[in-house]
Amino acid sequence: VALAGVLAASMMFTGCSKKEEAKSEGEIPKTIVVGTNAEFPPFEYVNDDKEIDGFDMAVMKEIGKRLDCKVKIKNMEFKSLIGAMESKNLDVIAAGMTVTDERKEAVDFTDSYYTSNQYIIVKEDSKVKKISDLDGKTIAVQEGTTGDLVASGDYDSVKDAKVKRFKKGVDAVMDLKKGGSDAVIIDANPAQEFVKANEGLRLIKDQSSKEYYAFAIQKGNKKLQKAINKELEAMKKDGTFDKLIKKYI
């Protein structure tokens, strides 16, 4: 009886250990709650049907389909996304988010799925030709983005600039158009979209080091992280990823 009790206890603790181990690996939720900021075309935006669309959304919906999970999208300010994830209100952030050491302290990231850098938007008659020409100038940015960090002097070579922060990238562009700022610093793809949609503006390209977009995952949720990485790789191999690139970017 004593031996049986020891064996039973041993099995019980082994079972608990496996459950704890599984729990520590995280989980793949039946409904994946995806946070985004739909002000970043072509990666995320509100389309003509008033739906949140874009490359990131299409990729996450395809991943959800392959994992047999529903995908629920929550639109919010970019600067609020990581806080919402830390509060366990989001499973994934899909928002053209650049991987940085600071962000890694709060969230985990999937493998990178896109490489970009920062462009400068100026008026056509502007004398600005390179990033160092913005020293001491007024720069409009979307708050919390890499453009904000560059304008603030955290990256590359902008010094002593006055930084005007906006909740939406388009608002930063409108401020430039009306003469409230000298330039906008923003990621390459949305920069091209904004200039295409607004006469009287021009681009100054490739003005920063490369940056890498990835999906953010709740810290420690290795199961979901591995699952998304696996499906991203599969999508690249079977051509689905390239089809979405051609459709949106």
Identify the residue ranges that each predicted region occupies:
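Periplasmic-binding protein-like
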Residues: A38, T115-V122, A188, Q192-E233, ...
